[in-house]
């Protein structure tokens, strides 16, 4: 007879200071700070940790923190959380730290960002840089459905205004913004202007996923209810065509994440109208409109009017990216920015999101990726197990 699965939950979260440039810090120093901060938040001792996921830093941190022998995960972004929860539920670990950080690795902005290498350095020189890849998807949607430039600006202004009210954001008190401010910034890749795009910054973060039946944790647990993962290929190597499909011929890259969202909701046993807050990944303004459609919060082609009607505002029916996201809160490399969607969701579900708290938040949806990167991942979190 197989052993009964244990209950895994996110029990600790921590963001280091985020900044455009954190002089005196390294990726390793920020990672160590984040580990200790998340464990303190969870009320779990370092001696109890028997698993870690931190990309290329994983084995370094296992050695530095004397965690071995320990389980090591290999996921990235939101996938780190699903992987850790599965490891705990199946007896491979009891307490797993997920950590990511970046400082001092991207200060020569004439070069491609290190987290897009080696792929982007071979295509960016021909004009296919990240903004252009996402712009291709946006322009196609605008052509087919009539999505307007103003609707993109509403998304960017909404998220940047969230960041302006978040004391932990890199761009705290930068704002408020109105849609005209977005198009007044310099053009980057049609239809995007500078303020449609993610910033670049430095910082670190960590989460603790643990067996809640074993630990007396300090904070209310947040449970993984469902997840889904859609990939169409490697990011930043090929033009991200809207119509790209796999052998099944269904759900083209333009709606990548639809299958992932359907799976996540099926696993969770939830309907879309039960979600209280959407911590959507926001590399560029249009990606929010695309995800709202792909995840079936509105019909295809209705994403633009949906945001124009105020649904994504902090006091709207579907508040999005409530910390300011990669546009305003932080964008410190591949894993920090992606993990921070889940960290913000945990803060909302705990009721600790400060001036940007969504009232009575019990269910949150998080996302990573986008059609320009040819993948989208989805995670549903709740303040109660299901």
Task: Name what the model sees in each region.
Residues 1-83, 87, 141-148, 170-171, ...:
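Conserved active-site "lid/cap" helical segment
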Residues 1-28, 154, 187-255, 259, ...:
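Condensing-enzyme catalytic core mediating Claisen C-C bond formation in acyl metabolism
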Residues 4-5, 51-133, 173-197, 230-234, ...:
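Conserved catalytic cysteine-centered active-site region
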Residues 15-17, 55-58, 76-77, 100-105, ...:
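Acidic, glycine-rich active-site loops and adjacent beta-strand->loop/helix elements
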Residues 46-55, 96-101, 150-158, 219-229, ...:
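Beta-strand segments within the central parallel beta-sheet cores of soluble alpha/beta enzyme folds
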Residues 58-65, 236-240, 282-305, 316, ...:
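Short glycine/threonine-rich loop-to-helix capping motif typified by GTGT followed
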Residues 73-102, 115, 131-168, 207-214, ...:
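Active-site-proximal alpha-helical scaffold in enzymes
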Residues 245-306, 317-322, 339, 343:
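C-terminal catalytic subdomain
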């Amino acid at each position: 007879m197989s052993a009964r699965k244990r209950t895994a939950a996110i029990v600790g979260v921590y963001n280091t200071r985020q900044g455009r440039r954190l002089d005196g810090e390294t990726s390793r120093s920020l990672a160590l700070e984040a580990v200790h901060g998340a464990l303190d938040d969870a009320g779990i001792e370092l001696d109890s940790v028997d698993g870690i996921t931190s990309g290329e830093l994983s084995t370094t941190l296992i050695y530095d923190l004397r965690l071995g022998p320990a389980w090591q995960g290999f996921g990235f972004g939101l996938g780190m959380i699903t992987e850790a929860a599965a490891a705990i539920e199946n007896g491979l670990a009891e307490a797993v730290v997920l950590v990511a950080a970046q400082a001092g690795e991207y200060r020569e902005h004439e070069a491609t960002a290190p987290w897009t290498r080696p792929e982007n350095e071979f295509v960016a020189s021909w004009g296919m840089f990240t903004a252009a890849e996402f712009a291709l998807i946006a322009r196609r949607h605008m052509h087919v459905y009539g999505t307007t430039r103003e609707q993109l600006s509403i998304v960017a202004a909404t998220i940047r205004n969230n960041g302006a009210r978040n004391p932990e954001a890199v761009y705290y008190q930068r704002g408020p913004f109105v849609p005209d401010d977005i198009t007044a910034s310099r053009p980057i890749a049609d239809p995007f202007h500078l303020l449609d795009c993610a910033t670049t910054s430095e910082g670190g973060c960590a989460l603790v996923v643990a067996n809640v039946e074993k630990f007396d944790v300090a904070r209310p647990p947040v449970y993984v209810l469902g997840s889904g993962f859609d990939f169409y290929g490697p990011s930043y190597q090929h033009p991200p065509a809207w119509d790209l499909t796999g052998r099944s011929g269904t759900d083209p890259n333009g709606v990548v994440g639809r299958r992932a969202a359907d799976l996540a909701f099926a696993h969770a046993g939830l309907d879309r109208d039960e979600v209280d807050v959407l911590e959507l990944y926001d590399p560029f303004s249009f990606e929010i409109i695309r995800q709202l459609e792909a995840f079936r919060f509105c019909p295809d082609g209705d994403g633009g009017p949906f945001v124009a009607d105020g649904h994504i505002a902090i006091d709207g029916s579907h508040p999005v990216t409530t910390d300011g996201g990669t546009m305003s809160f932080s964008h410190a490399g591949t894993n920090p920015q992606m993990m921070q969607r889940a960290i913000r969701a945990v803060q909302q579900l705990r009721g600790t999101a400060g001036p940007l708290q969504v009232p009575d938040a019990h269910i949150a949806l998080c996302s990573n990726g986008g059609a320009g990167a040819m993948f989208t991942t989805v995670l549903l979190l709740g303040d109660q197990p299901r």
